[in-house]
């Protein structure tokens, strides 16, 4: 009975997708700022 809780997986997946979304926005912001300041 020590298996992963099925109700926990969608939350982890949502948190991971949110983390990658924020990381992608951060990288795009850095690229755009370096492009505009050059």
From Swiss-Prot:
This is Photosystem II reaction center protein L. PSII is composed of 1 copy each of membrane proteins PsbA, PsbB, PsbC, PsbD, PsbE, PsbF, PsbH, PsbI, PsbJ, PsbK, PsbL, PsbM, PsbT, PsbX, PsbY, PsbZ, Psb30/Ycf12, at least 3 peripheral proteins of the oxygen-evolving complex and a large number of cofactors. It forms dimeric complexes. Pfam families: PsbL. Belongs to the PsbL family. The gene is psbL. It is found in: Plastid, Chloroplast thylakoid membrane. One of its GO terms (cellular component) is chloroplast thylakoid membrane. It comes from Porphyra purpurea. InterPro entries: PSII_PsbL, PSII_PsbL_sf.
